[in-house]
């Protein structure tokens, strides 16, 4: 768990339980609380931010999915069973994979499990989970040759060619060699 330094409604929170060697049992996991709840978490001193860093054995994760999201587990297993190996890359089968209901591991497993622990850390951490956080992490700067006209919330990252963006909002343009996103 990351040391919580402010009440943030965009992060998950971990409540420390009983001490374990090197960490704590996870007493509770709450994903993205409202502001009043986040303020209470910060005040009680027992909560850390979820840094999104998880370590599972394959079977443990599948057991948790089978327990808390059985349909998701079934589709994951089907996608793997029907998937294909291409050199060092494994591609799950598209049809069962596409049927999996969108849900994060935070909601699907971590809020429900009784078999989790946490290790508290204090480090330079930032959740680059939205455009504002990315902009803040980059000091708001676009990089590479660019020109923005009549734009809001636009970021450019180019390693070569000049990028011009006109009259657009809420986009990021990335140029990496011959690839453009």
State each model region's role:
Residues 1-99, 117:
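Conserved core of the sugar-phosphate nucleotidyltransferase
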Residues 58-181:
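Left-handed beta-helix
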